[in-house]
Amino acid sequence: MFSGFSSFGGGNGFVNMPQTFEEFFRCYPIAMMNDRIRKDDANFGGKIFLPPSALSKLSMLNIRYPMLFKLTANETGRVTHGGVLEFIAEEGRVYLPQWMMETLGIQPGSLLQISSTDVPLGQFVKLEPQSVDFLDISDPKAVLENVLRNFSTLTVDDVIEISYNGKTFKIKILEVKPESSSKSICVIETDLVTDFAPPVGYVEPDYKALKAQQDKEKKNSFGKGQVLDPSVLGQGSMSTRIDYAGIANSSRNKLSKFVGQGQNISGKAPKAEPKQDIKDMKITFDGEPAKLDLPEGQLFFGFPMVLPKEDEESAAGSKSSEQNFQGQGISLRKSNKRKTKSDHDSSKSKAPKSPEVIEID
């Protein structure tokens, strides 16, 4: 009679096929849990607390890991998804993160339908921060990689909450891939590509107008005790701005007593003398120093100076004085070499000297 079912399980009867878990619970926020079992960090995740009896039913129904659930609020018709953190809630109750209560639009004590489900592994998610304060995070992708470990699923249009440096940030799920009828993905043990939309309230600045305003402020700040950038005014180095060549040339002409213009007998105009380069100009300090008129807000730190070279004699003397440990070595052992003629005493030296002649007046 039941031979048509012999194909299940290889002809040995029925097998334990996964079945659907579906129950109704009274939902409450995590803040209303008993102090002994409450975990405030669970508010910044996507997992719920179920009673121990739910674990027994899930085991009997052969629900596969990871255990994912579809949460439906019949009062509002809203749906979201999540995982389970622990089975420590009171019988008939389920505890949800605060953001999940707001997403479903339900109040504490509302009736919530919870059923097991399967969603595809996530590959891509696009997020929209709900505040410009999110831009203060230096490395948002690294932060999300850490906080998303507290989530099992991400559902489109959900506004999740994360905590970073003592601040709470709200993030809306705009898009997920792969797409499915549940509009949700599983983020457990998967590589997830993350993209960000501009935060709510963020306005892209006009960089061209901002740069023009900064240049205008720099030009207007000239002469007001503020730092001046010569490149803004189109000026070059300090020597160019103070006309160092003209000042040095005028000072040199004052030292010349016979300054004038020569005339040729032939009537031809005299050849103009080539301009002398500033580097080749010889600077003397005998005359009166030239007046240095500087614009307001500029400083002058002196003319270029080349130190004189040391004389060769002084250099040689310094080198000789630097040579230390000069002397002659002496051997303590007598030499066995034969004496040369120069080593022997001459016979003249041994001969008696003649008496000196003394003259007596």
UniProtKB/Swiss-Prot annotation:
Region (Disordered): 310-361
Keyword Phosphoprotein: yes
GO CC terms of this entry: cytosol; Doa10p ubiquitin ligase complex; Hrd1p ubiquitin ligase ERAD-L complex; nucleus; replisome; RQC complex; VCP-NPL4-UFD1 AAA ATPase complex
Compositional bias of kind Polar residues: 317-329
Chain positions covered by the region annotation Monoubiquitin-binding: 27-28, 30-32, 99-101
Site (Monoubiquitin-binding): 37, 39, 109
Listed InterPro entries: Ufd1-like, Ufd1-like_Nn, UFD1_N1, UFD1_N2
Modified residues (Phosphoserine): 354
GO BP, one annotated term: retrograde protein transport, ER to cytosol
Note: Present with 3530 molecules/cell in log phase SD medium.
Family note: Belongs to the UFD1 family.
Subunit composition and interactions: Component of the heterotrimeric CDC48-NPL4-UFD1 ATPase complex. The CDC48-NPL4-UFD1 ATPase complex interacts with the HRD1 ubiquitin ligase complex composed of the E3 ligase HRD1, its cofactors HRD3, USA1 and DER1, substrate recruiting factor YOS9 and CDC48-binding protein UBX2. Interaction between the complexes is mediated by interaction between CDC48-NPL4-UFD1 complex member CDC48 and HRD1 complex member UBX2. Forms a complex composed of CDC48, NPL4, UFD1, DOA1, SHP1 and deubiquitinase OTU1. Interacts with NPL4, CDC48 and UBX2.
Protein name: Ubiquitin fusion degradation protein 1
Organism for this UniProt entry: Saccharomyces cerevisiae (strain ATCC 204508 / S288c)
Source taxonomy: Eukaryota, Fungi, Dikarya, Ascomycota, Saccharomycotina
UniProt gene name: UFD1
